[in-house]
Amino acid sequence: MDRFAALRGSLLLREFSDVGVRILAEACEERSVGRGTYAFRAGEPSTALCFIGRGTLQLQLREGGQALGELKSGDTVGNFALLAEGEHLVSAWAATDVELAVLERGAFETLRKQKPQASLKLMLALAQDFGERLREASGPLREFLAWQVSKRQA
């Protein structure tokens, strides 16, 4: 898999220059997930931002449960892993063979020291992505997210 191509195709990095994408791609590792296996399971530590280079991941609340949605080439998963420690809230099951470019928290910390501008731009892109998702959320999910944000500000 071409890590640069996987990251260049990511919506999260749409405003990055090729130089910025290359810097991030060099910090990533490649990971393959075979069809019918899990990239990660709900409750496991979330330690990396994953760029989907090829394939389809289905998100499930429980193993073998109904799919909540699908992520494909150009999508990312684990967006908060670089910003805060926590667990995966859902499981990611490979509906097809999947190729990921994985930016581990440790590699991001090294990048933060060596290339602070690129890491800051990534953090801003993650924050913008979260804001867009919050605006697009509806119903109980939107109310829950708004409550979580207001609770932290109190």
Task: For each feature predicted by the language model, list its residue ranges.
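Cytosolic regulatory regions built on CNB/CRP/Popeye-like sensor folds
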Residues: 1-154
